[in-house]
Amino acid sequence: MEINTDKYKNITRNLEREMINLNPIQRGGILPTESKKIIYEYWDGYSVCDYCSGRLDRIETPPINEFLEDMSKFLGMDITRPTHGARESKYAVMNSICKEGDYVVLDGNAHYTSYVAIERAKLNYEKTDIGEYPTFRVIPESYAEKIDMLEDSKKNIGLILLTHVDGNYGNVADVEKVGKIAKSKGYPFLLNCAYSAGRMPIDGKKLNVDFIAASGHKSMAASGPCGLLSINKKYEDEVLETSKVNVVKELQMLGCTSRGIPILSLMASFERLIERVKKWDLELEKTRKVVNELEPLGFKQIGEKPRNHDIIRFETPILDEIAEKDKRRGFFFYEELKRRGLGGIRRGVTKEFKMSVYGLTNTQVDYVINSMKTIINELR
């Protein structure tokens, strides 16, 4: 068998080294320098298992067991387990506490992985209403309406799911209202915090949450794939049920999950997470500044106003107008940004785009704003 492996050698990526990355799916997952150092110690397969005591969450060296206890405090929950991502966390909950055919009531802004998890767990769903253009806010009262409708139809409800911050518009849902509805109706409540935990303060107990699904690589300065599932002790026996064959292994975790660099990078970044969520107001100031400075150019921010999250979605008719007369067509914006050391915006996009300045310095934010102003003013 002959296979040419030359294309797999010397694979490189220079986006983070040479450019300012504006991609909202990546801004929260950028590793600080101190976290990168740990990669050299744990890049071998199963290196975290040097002193394994039978299960990942019980490993003492490195102190994964203590880290998970501390993470529970950080999130305001009782018990935390590492997973491969928020999607796996959601599936673990659905597959353990719901019965086949049960309904999951979820918001209209839910991520596609919520639906995939529902389908994989052989469940049904009922989607709640959201506000109209241009805000698209989750309507908490719609949860009560959908629950009543399902109950009247004699449908079994297994779970209430809410996307804390959606990836399309960056809207922050009213968790407390939905949590009160779930509690009053007597249903378990799962909060998808893929875009929030690690970026902004989260306290599950204050929010009436039973489960938190978090993403290490999306919002907690960790390499991927890595996530967390935090639960209330009330659901420990159901969600963390162990195998009858190997009694130490938890079924929903398939024994062990993130057993390598991802979980170690998350641990190394933990101190940074604790500090950065305290500065969330400063992140919002930077985000709102971007919106206020760019809208006069002909950009229109979609989603709730003022911004309560770092994800910014712009409709950009002005870019469309420029693309019609520029010989580069829809690629001009990407190329002009790249020429100025800015990346993370999709190539060929002119009708709308998403961006984030999370974690950038004020000087960098000003540079981003001024660069976009220059591009528009020179080419319009």
UniProtKB/Swiss-Prot annotation:
<feature type="binding site">
    <location>
        <position position="192"/>
    </location>
    <ligand>
        <name>pyridoxal 5'-phosphate</name>
    </ligand>
</feature>
<dbReference type="Pfam" id="PF05889">
    <property type="entry name" value="SepSecS"/>
</dbReference>
<dbReference type="GO" id="GO:0006412">
    <property type="term" value="P:translation"/>
</dbReference>
<dbReference type="InterPro" id="IPR015421">
    <property type="entry name" value="PyrdxlP-dep_Trfase_major"/>
</dbReference>
<dbReference type="InterPro" id="IPR013375">
    <property type="entry name" value="Sep_Cys-tRNA_synth_arc"/>
</dbReference>
<feature type="binding site">
    <location>
        <begin position="215"/>
        <end position="217"/>
    </location>
    <ligand>
        <name>pyridoxal 5'-phosphate</name>
    </ligand>
</feature>
<keyword id="KW-0648">Protein biosynthesis</keyword>
<keyword id="KW-0808">Transferase</keyword>
<keyword id="KW-0663">Pyridoxal phosphate</keyword>
<comment type="subunit">
    <text>Homodimer. Interacts with SepRS.</text>
</comment>
<feature type="binding site">
    <location>
        <begin position="86"/>
        <end position="87"/>
    </location>
    <ligand>
        <name>pyridoxal 5'-phosphate</name>
    </ligand>
</feature>
<comment type="function">
    <text>Converts O-phospho-L-seryl-tRNA(Cys) (Sep-tRNA(Cys)) to L-cysteinyl-tRNA(Cys) (Cys-tRNA(Cys)).</text>
</comment>
<dbReference type="InterPro" id="IPR015424">
    <property type="entry name" value="PyrdxlP-dep_Trfase"/>
</dbReference>
<feature type="modified residue" description="N6-(pyridoxal phosphate)lysine">
    <location>
        <position position="218"/>
    </location>
</feature>
<dbReference type="InterPro" id="IPR015422">
    <property type="entry name" value="PyrdxlP-dep_Trfase_small"/>
</dbReference>
<dbReference type="GO" id="GO:0043766">
    <property type="term" value="F:Sep-tRNA:Cys-tRNA synthase activity"/>
</dbReference>
<comment type="similarity">
    <text>Belongs to the SepCysS family.</text>
</comment>
<protein>
    <recommendedName>
        <fullName>O-phospho-L-seryl-tRNA:Cys-tRNA synthase</fullName>
        <ecNumber>2.5.1.73</ecNumber>
    </recommendedName>
</protein>
<dbReference type="InterPro" id="IPR008829">
    <property type="entry name" value="SepSecS/SepCysS"/>
</dbReference>
